[in-house]
Regions:
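Active-site beta-loop-alpha junctions enriched in small/polar residues
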Residues: 109, 137, 167-169
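Glycine-rich phosphate/adenosyl-contacting loop at the front of the ribokinase-like
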Residues: 1-77, 116
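A short, aliphatic-rich alpha-helical micro-motif
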Residues: 125-127, 184-188
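Conserved N-terminal subdomain of the carbohydrate kinase-like
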Residues: 51-134
């Protein structure tokens, strides 16, 4: 087991509203911020003094380049981030309720991260892995799901812990049973999980 936290999954631009407590159509301005739950975990781990790497695929577009730059400036190793011209970087418009809860409107049909394939995952990436962290957003029926399976297999071979944040985003799943079955499919791989009250 090494000392680097590796996360795999989506990175996107969150468009944060200038106003809270109102519907999307009432918001007059949004600010673009780099986000995505797995990327945020890398950022938090780095702030706490740890070493982190992030595996994702971004669109070869201004949003993708912004995310890559923001990750690097946060101290996250971006050597495992790839780019594609086959799809754009994912976007999410956010509305904020007065109690702090959020509603998301996603633009990723498909997005670049969804097209990241198992063939792109390399065993040597996990030589210094302390833990591998992932979420459910990237486990739909597209290539990134198989990339997760391969990453988990390599990480377990290297003795790394496996951490899972369900982070259920129901609007991204047309079939709620498929989401339920997919989460259950990955649970046997885990050492840690971190569901929120809304999950």
């Amino acid at each position: 087991m090494g000392n680097t936290l590796i996360a795999i999954g989506e990175a996107l631009i969150d468009f944060i509203p200038a106003q809270t407590g109102c519907a999307f159509e009432e918001v007059t301005a949004f600010s673009p911020k780099s986000g995505g739950a797995p990327a945020n975990v890398c950022g938090a781990f780095t702030i706490l003094g740890g070493s982190s790497k992030f595996i994702t695929q971004l669109g070869d577009d201004p949003f993708g380049r912004k995310i890559a730059g923001d990750l690097a400036r946060a101290g996250i190793d971006t050597s495992l981030v790839s780019f594609t011209d086959k799809a754009n970087t994912a976007l999410a418009f956010v509305s904020l309720e007065n109690d702090g809860n959020r509603t998301f409107s996603f633009y990723r049909k498909p997005s670049a991260d969804m097209l990241f394939s198992a063939e792109q995952v390399k065993e040597e990436w996990f030589e210094d892995a302390y833990a591998l962290h992932f979420c459910s957003v990237s486990l739909g029926d597209f290539p990134m799901k198989d990339a997760h399976k391969k990453a988990i297999a390599y990480a377990r071979q290297k003795g790394a812990m496996i951490s899972f944040d369900p982070n259920l985003r129901f609007p991204l799943w047309n079939d709620k049973k498929a989401l339920h079955d997919t989460v259950n499919e990955f649970i046997p791989c885990l050492l840690y999980t971190s569901p929120s009250p809304r999950d």
